[in-house]
Amino acid sequence: MKIAGQVSLADLPRVCPLLCRSDDSEYGEDKTRVVEVRGVRFGDERPVVIGGPCAVETREQTLNVARAVRRAGAEMLRGGAYKPRTSPHGFQGTGADGLRILKDAREETGLPVVTEAMDTRHVEQVAEFADMIQIGSRNMQNFPLLAEAGRAGKPVLLKRGMAASLVEWLGAAEYIAEQGNLDIVLCERGIKAFASGEYSRYVLDLNVIPAVRAHTFLPVIVDPSHATGVASMVEPASRAALEFGSHGLIIEVADPTTARPMCDAVQAIGPETLARIARFAHARSSSAVEGVSCA
């Protein structure tokens, strides 16, 4: 029985004609599109490591973390200037001031910056300061925002919605691609399940990594910080994600010399842990995934 609005992986060629793998595509059955962000190449042989604070709180805090993640081996800097919070009473970020701090951090460290745009009104401003625009989990199906990000002329990091199927996730990416922008990197960041919150923040869906690689030519990375919500789990989750073929990682890092982070402090790792993860990542090839496939 056909149900209105129901789609499956079999519908991908119709739902995502721009991003779905096909025999006549230049990417064929197994090639990945390389998305370049100021010299950092997603989808290439070497997995990319992105590190930085959950939120840009102060100039000192952000610059300290930026220096630390660069020393640890990260290739890009993350940090939220605009913050989507569960409660309106939580810290909402530093906005435009935070974007300027991120720009200063990039100029000092040389690390390209990825940060989130939460609203269509923010996209132009974020694109002015950042090298890559992030669309967060809560906005994965904010279709006007996706289209605006696609028109901004910058690569886009699209996080999976916490309750989104693979088809819905790729359908969201198609909104960006329809604007003529194929420089999209997908990010698995954990999904909600019956056990969510019992012993981890979300459930890290490792199985989706080979599925993404089988059905689209876009690179896919993993956010082990939000997926686990526990700092001690971030390193093993990172290793597992790379074993499953992730093209990279985006990880929250705290500066131990400054105050406790205002957001998600318990999931932030220290620079030493990031350095171990980076060494593991850079010793691997994201294109050689033994024994992991999704027909």
How would you label these PLM feature ranges?
Residues 47-64, 88-92, 112-116, 136-137, ...:
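Active-site mouth loops of central-metabolism enzymes
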Residues 32-54, 85-88, 213-222:
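N-terminal small/glycine-rich loop or linker at the start of catalytic domains
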Residues 78-96, 255-265:
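Glycine-rich, proline-tolerant flexible connector loops at the mouths of alpha/beta enzymes
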Residues 10-21, 78, 114, 134, ...:
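Conserved beta-strand positions in the central sheet of alpha/beta enzyme cores
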Residues 1-49:
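Non-catalytic terminal accessory/regulatory regions of metabolic enzymes
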Residues 91-115, 149-155, 206-220, 244, ...:
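Alpha-helix-loop-beta-strand connector modules within alpha/beta enzyme cores
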